[in-house]
Amino acid sequence: MTKRLLLRLLIALASVSGMAQCCPEKPATEKREALWQKLQEEFRSVDHGLDGVMGLAVKDLTSGETFFIHGDEVMPQASSIKIALLANLYLQAQQSKLKLTEEYVVRQEDLVSGSDIMLGLTAGVTRLTLRDLATMMVAVSDNSATNVLIRRVGMENVNAMLDSLGLHATRLRRQMMDLKAAGEGRENVSTPREMMTLLETIYRGKLLNKEMTADFIKMLSTHKESSLLQGLPDDVAAASKPGELEAVRNDSGIVLLKGRPYILCVMTTYLRDEKDGSAAIRKISALTYSYFDRVARASEYGRVVSPK
């Protein structure tokens, strides 16, 4: 090999080496971070387009990453507060303070509006277990069933449990359909961050034992009308509870996506049109699922191979 040819070869190798150093391949985490940042931009776009106020908390239960919009704002929960009530019901069952098989006889004085099932039952005759009441509370948001459970577990015990978890902004302050209490400002409230924390605490088995945790998640996964669920494919389950009041639409839950479960809490208030709140929740849910589904099925390079 001539000296001139050798010199050209060395120059070429040096050039390739320099290109590699100035343009290194992005690590897998950086690629995913870019996708995560784009998702956050889409969240903000939904928030800016909503004629109302939106609170949002998202948590990747695999990586621990979180994102918030108005994460610490106290917001009305409507029926989403029933997540805290259900958690305390299961906690008291675990502590042998009550049994989920304990029976209750329907009483006429316990019936309130927003109770599609309870209002159709025969007072003084029909017997229901606490588990039956919990199922009605979750599946159809039956307010009479909810009020019976509130009286059975004790509002003060629900709030004491929340205090023990450091969730001081999350409060159960009144029974369902208590318009007098609502008019006095006694609203059932939480923040996106605290509701997310409550759900994660339960999911990770830090409140209930393994058996009770599994039963709780199964109960909260009971099929229901839900904007969060409408943003998911039919084969993806979520342990969630929506809530509705005038000018308020909420939905909070654990999305049980295989390989990449996550928590999503969306709260909307000051709505001019409640349909806009529901639409925003559906959009946020669909966007979040799209991100986590890709991350769950992708290689470190972002290649997704779908099953045939």
Per-region residue spans from a language model:
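Bacterial Sec-dependent N-terminal signal peptides
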Residues: 1-25
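Structured C-terminal helix/loop/strand segments within mature extracytoplasmic catalytic/sensor domains
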Residues: 22-49, 152-154, 197-226, 233, ...
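A short, well-structured edge-of-sheet supersecondary motif
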Residues: 38-71
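Mid-domain, small-residue-enriched loop/turn segments at the edges of structured enzyme/sensor domains
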Residues: 53, 126, 147-199, 203-204
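Soluble periplasmic/extracytoplasmic beta-strand elements of cell-envelope proteins
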Residues: 55-59, 67-68, 84, 105, ...
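Acidic helix-start/capping segments at beta-turn-to-alpha-helix junctions
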Residues: 61, 100-117, 153-154, 219, ...
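Active-site SXXK
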Residues: 64, 76-104, 264
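Conserved catalytic neighborhood of penicillin-recognizing serine enzymes
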Residues: 111-147
